[in-house]
Amino acid sequence: MASTVVAVGLTIAAAGFAGRYVLQAMKHVEPQVKQVFQSLPKSAFGGGYYRGGFEPKMTKREAALILGVSPTANKGKIRDAHRRIMLLNHPDKGGSPYIAAKINEAKDLLEGQAKK
């Protein structure tokens, strides 16, 4: 029993010293890490998403971007994409009513122009 307590105490002390060493080492490495992140291109962090607001009148391109489908997608793909996005952003589950309205508008616009 006593040897277990000693082993636990030594482990906690070793973890404390290791944590202190890591924190001190981070102070010396921090400027280098900042420099590396500043040298990376801006597109490395958010380039995969559309970075703009909504247009006053929704276009076919904008509707396709909202649903994440091709502008020439068929009705089945449009419905699947709409369902997937609305499950994530439904107003009854805490989603934005404005975004939900835009998603529905995008579906209506693309379905009106899509083929079966």
UniProtKB/Swiss-Prot annotation:
The organism of origin for this protein: Mus musculus (Mouse)
Q: Which residues lie on this side of the membrane: Mitochondrial matrix?
A: 25-116
Domain of life the protein comes from: Eukaryota
User: What family classification does the UniProt entry report for this protein?
Assistant: Belongs to the TIM14 family.
- Please provide one cellular component term from the Gene Ontology annotations of this protein: inner mitochondrial membrane protein complex
Report the membrane topology from the UniProt record.
Single-pass membrane protein
Localization of this protein:
Mitochondrion inner membrane
* Residues carrying N-acetylalanine: A2
* Gene name, Swiss-Prot/TrEMBL: Dnajc19
User: What is this protein's function?
Assistant: Mitochondrial co-chaperone which forms a complex with prohibitins to regulate cardiolipin remodeling. May be a component of the PAM complex, a complex required for the translocation of transit peptide-containing proteins from the inner membrane into the mitochondrial matrix in an ATP-dependent manner. May act as a co-chaperone that stimulate the ATP-dependent activity.
Q: What is this protein called?
A: Mitochondrial import inner membrane translocase subunit TIM14
InterPro entries hit by this protein: DnaJ_domain, J_dom_sf
Phosphoserine is carried by which residues? S39, S70
Where would you say this protein principally sits, based on its record? mitochondrion
Quaternary assembly: Interacts with PHB2; the interaction associates DNAJC19 with the prohibitin complex. Interacts with TIMM16/PAM16. May be a component of the PAM complex at least composed of a mitochondrial HSP70 protein, GRPEL1 or GRPEL2, TIMM44, TIMM16/PAM16 and TIMM14/DNAJC19.
A single GO BP term for this record reads:
regulation of cardiolipin metabolic process
**Keyword vocabulary terms for this entry:** Acetylation, Chaperone, Membrane, Mitochondrion, Mitochondrion inner membrane, Phosphoprotein, Protein transport, Translocation, Transmembrane, Transmembrane helix, Transport
